[in-house]
Amino acid sequence: MSEENPVFQIQRVYLKDLSLEQPNSPQILLEQEQPNVDIQLGVEAAPVADGIFEVAVTATVQTKIKDKTVFLVEAKQAGIFEIRNIPEDQMGPIMGIACPQIVYPYLRGNIADVITRAGFPPVHLAEINFQAMYEQQQSQLASAAPTPGVTQ
């Protein structure tokens, strides 16, 4: 009977990749103008073994003054999850919503920390509604898919 019980366990959360670039330092540090901040997020999921999945949240934080980069941080925080005996129609939401919600706070902390250690005021990533993000991705995929029976 226990073989059929749903299993959802965090095996590990880890920082998979982190890079910081300051291509225009030290000159750019003398600028008085406020930089523009651009933040891009993404979620990836992949099977690792039977019932074991890696879910990663990536973030790119780029600050610029005019057309010059002040700093660029790219980070990928990942988690290994054991997910078994879950109905197939629930796997997408688990890996696209539940797992990223677990991993994301670690990513936020690591990004704020590396930016601060680089000598800049921290950039705090906002809370993310992963359900809305997942639903938007699903609707984009649905609208991009050809309609059955319709030829183009």
From Swiss-Prot:
The keyword Phosphoprotein does not apply. Homotetramer, a dimer of dimers. One homotetramer interacts with 1 SecA dimer. Pfam families: SecB (PF02556). It is found in: Cytoplasm. GO terms for cellular component: cytoplasm. One of the proteins required for the normal export of preproteins out of the cell cytoplasm. It is a molecular chaperone that binds to a subset of precursor proteins, maintaining them in a translocation-competent state. It also specifically binds to its receptor SecA. One of its GO terms (biological process) is protein folding. This is Protein-export protein SecB. HAMAP family: SecB. One of its GO terms (molecular function) is unfolded protein binding. Disulfide bonds: none annotated. Signal peptide: none annotated. Belongs to the SecB family. Keywords: Chaperone, Cytoplasm, Protein transport, Translocation, Transport. The keyword Ubl conjugation does not apply.
